[in-house]
Curated annotation (Swiss-Prot):
Reaction(s) catalysed (UniProt annotation): [phosphate](n) + ATP = [phosphate](n+1) + ADP
Species name: Erythrobacter litoralis (strain HTCC2594)
A Pfam family it matches: PP_kinase_N
UniProt name for this protein: Polyphosphate kinase
Any GO BP annotation: polyphosphate biosynthetic process
Gene3D superfamilies, A to Z: Endonuclease Chain A, Polyphosphate kinase middle domain, Polyphosphate kinase N-terminal domain
Keywords recorded for this protein, A-Z: ATP-binding, Kinase, Magnesium, Metal-binding, Nucleotide-binding, Phosphoprotein, Transferase
Spans traversing the lipid bilayer: none
Intrachain S-S bonds: none
Gene this chain is encoded by: ppk
Classification via InterPro entries: PP_kinase, PP_kinase_C_1, PP_kinase_middle, PP_kinase_middle_dom_sf, PPK_C_dom2, PPK_N_dom, PPK_N_dom_sf
Job description of the protein: Catalyzes the reversible transfer of the terminal phosphate of ATP to form a long-chain polyphosphate (polyP).
Lineage: Bacteria, Pseudomonadati, Pseudomonadota, Alphaproteobacteria, Sphingomonadales
Cofactor: Mg(2+)
Length: 715
């Protein structure tokens, strides 16, 4: 992998048919989940970590059904015949997706059966009825009567009783009862407050699923009846929220929309393979909505529920614990984050470096008497947020505090409404941004009174201000006191709070204004350099790439001889390695202990890559239409040389060199694991064992970080 163009046969005409140029977005998303599922079979991982990947794959598929499948069902029902970028109608996509979902679901069950045996061998027993001895039975019975039975409400399904509402992701049981020659069907919905698995006390772990526990003691629910059949079912509903642009009260509109989502159209009804026929017929009749799919599962319903078992206290079955580092540069200044930033820009690489640095940035601003103003954009902040607490404290301390709270963050709408209300009560000026655009930018600014006048300190991130995801997502936090970026950040906030379109930005690019054009210009510059015989290369790292105009621009660059290396964790509509179209493009995906989430865009700029002259950006945006045209995002150029070296020659290069947890995308859409070869390299392990460049401070001279170098054949 050098920086010089690769020659190609320019006599070949590039493909013109959509299906030959682009992959289908939905199928590419499912291919990502297939790679996640493959980690559940990774023998090099501890057992409970493999179970975690299986659980994540289940959660991913649930969300896919609730959002993407629901969207396709809606298009089919409305008669929409607009084709996708790869030329498929909604009906064709839906058929392909449903077939692929069936394959993935069957594979999940096969993997679960295998893992269940291995877990039992390791002393973790799940749904193993043979291990329920007299002592365990006694404890389970007492637990059922004390903690389960009071929460259950059996409901008869007959003309005298309305059919009960089953909430989204609702899990329930149907029992066919008999007494005096008459049959009756009863439904028991399992409250979401109950855990999916109950652990029986004991040295060896024994977990019993909530549905099997209720079934075991069902006679206590129906005294005097004979139970002649039973079965477990699960419902997934349309969970997307659509907000009309003319909405007058955004908060009230979202509260109503959240209520509607709970009652969205049924998209999938999942039942056990051995479901009672009488109960099944009734359930189908009552839930037979147009477009709903019925799935019979030979195994566990709602495999995401296995997350309960991952919490088992067995360190020997999990990854070795890891404690993130706190940057030495900040410690050298006795924890004064502002002094550390004044000395030099810093980039923090999460989760290898502590998210507490970000929290401390806001917390210190809240109590610093010289800080006069704080502005913060919040997209996802979690259920417990020290950042929100610090903003509240700042407002209570008399500082001017502005928070942009995005209500349209999917599945976090209700939590964000809560945070907005808490912030407003404390005196924070809360802004909800645009009705038709999401504010996805990750930015905070602090204005501080100093001897020379007011100075602005900024934080730009690639990830959310979320304490939980910051422990498992790889992201970058860039701290700077560069006055140019401070002025740009102020204009960005004014854009969101007052709709004042930023003009004459000095460094930042902002979508939907000029972020797309900034990346276009950088790609075009590489084409000019390639045609002039100069080194020309593009390295990009992102979560997804689906924007066809951006993909076409990269195809043009490939045809011009620009070498392009993409690290795309998830959806990739770009088809690499196609003669005459994308010969010079290679795409890889990294799936490992941590979830790759940072976005980095780098361009050779006429010199061999990686080099000091390379143009490097970090961003909140992926290369998707929504990020480039329908969201407020930021693209931040990296000028500081130490930070530049860290982002390009440490973070991005390590991702390209990784061969232990990497998959390479083939021209036909399949992914193959990258061969380790003579020298193995795991980028997650490298970051866990080597400190970053910009955060080391004076310690950098005492102990240099091992320098990475390109090697031939690396992706």
């Amino acid at each position: 992998m050098g920086s010089h163009p690769i020659t190609q046969d320019n006599d070949l005409d590039p493909p013109t048919e959509p299906g030959e140029r682009y992959f289908n977005r939905e199928l590419s998303w499912l291919a990502f989940n297939d790679r996640v599922l493959a980690e559940a079979c990774n023998d090099s991982y501890p057992l409970l970590e493999r179970l975690r990947f299986l659980s994540i794959s289940g959660s991913n598929l649930d969300e896919f059904v609730m959002i993407r499948v629901a969207g396709l069902v809606g298009q089919v029902q409305r008669g929409i015949d607009e084709v996708s970028d790869d030329g498929r109608s909604p009906r064709e996509q839906l058929n392909a997706v449903v077939a692929r979902l069936e394959e993935l679901s069957e594979r999940q069950q096969d993997i679960w059966r295998n893992l269940r045996v291995q877990l039992a061998d390791a002393g973790v027993h799940v749904a193993d009825e043979e291990r329920v001895n007299a002592e365990a039975y006694g404890w389970l019975k007492q637990h059922f009567f004390e903690s389960i039975l009071p929460l259950l409400t059996p409901q008869a399904l007959d003309p005298a009783h309305p059919f009960p509402f089953i909430s989204n992701e609702g899990l329930g049981l149907l029992f066919t009862l008999r007494r005096g020659g008459e049959e009756l069907v009863e439904m028991v919905l399992i409250p979401s407050a109950l855990p999916r698995f109950i652990r029986v006390p004991g040295e060896d772990a024994l977990y019993i699923s909530i549905e099997s526990l209720i079934t075991r003691f069902a006679k206590e629910l129906f005294p005097g009846f004979e139970i002649v059949g039973d079965g477990t079912f699960r419902v997934l509903r349309d969970s997307d929220i659509e907000i009309q642009e003319e909405a007058e009260d955004l908060v009230r509109t979202f509260r109503s929309a959240i209520q509607r989502r709970r009652r969205g159209q049924v998209i999938q009804l999942e039942i056990e393979e051995e479901f009672d026929p009488t109960a099944e017929a009734l359930l189908r009749e009552k839930l037979d909505t147009p477009g709903a799919t019925f799935v019979k599962t030979d195994g566990m319903l709602g495999i995401a529920g296995l997350a309960d078992i991952v919490d088992e206290d067995r360190p020997d079955l999990k990854f070795d614990s890891y404690s993130p580092r706190y940057p030495e540069r900040v410690l050298e200044h006795d924890g004064d984050i502002f002094a550390a930033i004044r000395e030099k820009d810093i980039v923090i690489h999460h989760p290898y470096e502590s998210f507490n640095v970000v929290v401390d940035f806001i917390r210190r601003a809240a109590i610093d008497p010289d800080v006069v103003a704080i502005k913060q954009a919040l997209y996802r902040a979690g259920t417990q947020s020290e950042v929100v607490d610090a903003l509240v404290e700042a407002a209570e301390n008399g500082k001017s505090v502005t928070a942009v709270v995005e209500l349209k963050a999917r599945f976090d709408e209700e939590q964000n409404l809560y945070w907005a209300n808490k912030l407003e009560r404390a005196g924070v000026q809360v802004i909800y941004g645009f009705v038709d655009w999401k504010t996805h930018a990750k930015v905070a600014m602090v204005v501080r009174r100093e001897e020379e006048g007011f100075r602005t300190y900024c934080h730009f991130g690639t990830g959310n201000y979320h304490p939980i995801t910051a422990k498992i997502y790889t992201d970058l936090s860039y701290f700077t006191a560069d006055p140019r970026l401070g002025r740009d950040a102020a204009k960005l906030f004014n854009f969101v709070t007052g709709y004042v379109e930023p003009r004459e930005l000095e460094m930042l690019a902002v979508s939907p204004i000029d972020l797309r054009e900034t990346i276009y210009a950088a790609i075009d510059n590489e084409m000019v350099n390639a045609q002039a015989g100069k080194p020309a290369a593009i390295w990009m790292k992102m979560n997804q790439i689906t924007d066809v105009d951006m993909i076409d621009r990269l195809y043009e660059a490939s045809q011009a001889g620009v070498e392009i290396q993409l690290v795309v964790r998830g959806i990739c509509n770009l088809r690499p390695g196609v003669p005459g179209m994308s010969d010079n493009i290679r795409v890889k995906s990294i799936i490992g202990r941590f979830l790759e989430h940072s976005r980095i865009y780098a361009f050779a700029n006429g010199e061999p890559m990686p080099g000091t002259s390379s143009t490097v950006y970090i961003s909140s945006a992926d290369l998707m239409v929504r990020n480039l045209d329908r969201r407020v995002e930021q693209l931040v150029p990296i000028d500081n040389q130490t930070v530049h070296d860290q982002v390009l020659q440490q973070v991005l290069l390590a991702n390209l060199l990784d061969n232990e947890q990497s998959w390479e995308l083939q021209p036909d859409g399949s992914y193959f694991r990258v061969e380790v070869g003579e020298k193995s390299f795991n980028c997650h392990r490298y970051f866990m064992t080597n400190p970053s460049l910009s955060g080391r401070g004076g310690a950098l001279e005492a102990g240099a970080v091992p320098k990475l170098a390109l090697r031939k054949g690396a992706v």
